[in-house]
Amino acid sequence: SVGFKAGVKDYRLTYYTPDYETKDTDILAAFRVTPQPGVPPEEAGAAVAAESSTGTWTTVWTDGLTSLDRYKGRCYHIEAVVGEENQFIAYVAYPLDLFEEGSVTNMFTSIVGNVFGFKALRALRLEDLRIPPAYSKTFQGPPHGIQVERDKLNKYGRPLLGCTIKPKLGLSAKNYGRAVYECLRGGLDFTKDDENVNSQPFMRWRDRFLFCAEAIYKAQAETGEIKGHYLNATAGTCEEMIKRAIFARELGVPIVMHDYLTGGFTANTSLAHYCRDNGLLLHIHRAMHAVIDRQKNHGMHFRVLAKALRMSGGDHIHAGTVVGKLEGEREMTLGFVDLLRDDFIEKDRSRGIFFTQDWVSMPGVIPVASGGIHVWHMPALTEIFGDDSVLQFGGGTLGHPWGNAPGAVANRVALEACVQARNEGRDLAQEGNEIIREACKWSPELA
């Protein structure tokens, strides 16, 4: 007599369990599934659960040596997507023990590592993840978080202002440092290395770090405010990255930066640990995110990447603008902005939030609005993002006809005007342009 029947078997027999009650410790995922024609949604959903946990395409005799009931992912609910034919949201619950503690890398390898090339699916998108406290507590999270950052910078009650130094490639270190100084001197809080500035022949990283540090100290001395420049520590190896972070710390600068998707979560988590241990703030740029999150029916939504970053660690992360040159729908953006900053976020499907997320006491991340924004967007940005944000104007500062410093002045004046107007109870959405025009009377740079 044979122990079990060989051959291909339906996943839904084992992995589709509509009556499963999810546990508080389960990691829950919401997938947008587009099955191939002829594949029933239950089978597609079960296939996702199986291939991203314990399953394979047939029964193997070693299945008898483990408890599938304890370790299998389960597709516990399927709903049709309104307005799309043949698209479904499949909800999958993963037992906590499938994941290594404190490793975003392993979490993604398990949940999205294998299943996206699956034949029975035409397309697959991970829309949201519910991270249980039992798992999130195994992560350090952001090196410092919003409150500690405000205390370090001594800046309260307003958004922070930044600017990416352009042209992003081709400046010498000395001219680069000069641009940094002018922007900070004019009134910005931060300037930023572009994400592609690492250590190229025209400007090696050490030279850039030195000139930028000089610019920071000079601007601090002249303005009496704490200034920062996001020194991009991203490098070809983790060791080199940490070496750059150490050099930044020795120069006494407040903040470094990392491209977390191109650099990878393992490198990012290492850097975040270094930053907490050594009092550096960590700015995160999301270069490469659109490769993963741009397609509506395949890939991963950015809110998942944002949650992962909060666990891996970063104090700032780019989060779209809602108003500038890059796409991003307002409600969705606000949804993951809350996921980055708040402690407890209610499920809210209208904002794309599929699960109630409780971060317990993990520090928050400051969202950075950046990309094609300028002073006329300031009222909208102040209203949408609130105080705990960084507003970054690249061309919006350096494009000023009088130069960088006046561009910085214009931005700072506009910001202060908006914050003051808001605190006086005026409606930024309605009177935004009027507020900016009034401010122009006091500031020739803005006019």
Swiss-Prot record:
It catalyses: 2 (2R)-3-phosphoglycerate + 2 H(+) = D-ribulose 1,5-bisphosphate + CO2 + H2O; D-ribulose 1,5-bisphosphate + O2 = 2-phosphoglycolate + (2R)-3-phosphoglycerate + 2 H(+). Substrate binds at N114, T164, K168, R286, H318, S370. The active site is at K166, H285. The modification N6-carboxylysine is found at K192. This is Ribulose bisphosphate carboxylase large chain. Belongs to the RuBisCO large chain family. Type I subfamily. It is found in: Plastid, Chloroplast. Its cofactor is Mg(2+). Mg(2+) binds at K192, D194, E195.
